Amino acid sequence: MLFRFGSDRWLGVHLGMTGKLSAEPPDHWPGKHDHLILYTRTLALVFQDPRLFGRIRFDCSRQAPKWWSSLPTPVLSREFSIPRLSEILKKRGRTPLKPLLLLQEFFPGIGNWMADEILWQAHLHPRTRAGTLVQPAIAGLHAKIQKISKEAIRIIGRDWSDPPRSWLFLHRWEDGGKCPRCRELLRRQSVGGRTTCWCPACQKAALPRRRSRS
């Protein structure tokens, strides 16, 4: 987020994983995890971040800071279209979907559990290579990226509430957890160096193509 003050003052805020901005009364007293408070006559804008993953930047210039214009396309913007997603998948064709979704230069804001949730809801195996997706699967992946991102902001970003139990989220942490869709035992392994959870029944791995004999 970028805030402008006057003609040449800019404040950039990156929430990170646990950061939160809130509007509080003007007499707000700093809490343990309050790292920036902007006081006005009517309210206090408070930046809280328990795990210190967020960032604050201050710039002085007539134009918006250069780093702002170089940020990747937000996944909830109009520019993040199905053709745009198709380009990314083609460009990183050999990369498995799970580690690809975690690349912030393509999918800013998507973290580990969100990537698992997106793939589970899209019925895609986390090791599926990006370049193997056909158009209906790409459209489905695009829809789930935007749906999960919107719901994460609405549900979790508001007051840290848990998503509904119909999601993978609450079951992916449990030993012996079962898929909320088909009740199959969930599987957890490292994919691309990150702990990954999926349902082997709902997210079947694509069979390797047979080489034609010459």
For each feature predicted by the language model, list its residue ranges.
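Basic, nucleic-acid-binding surfaces and adjacent catalytic neighborhoods in DNA/RNA-processing proteins
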Residues: 86-214
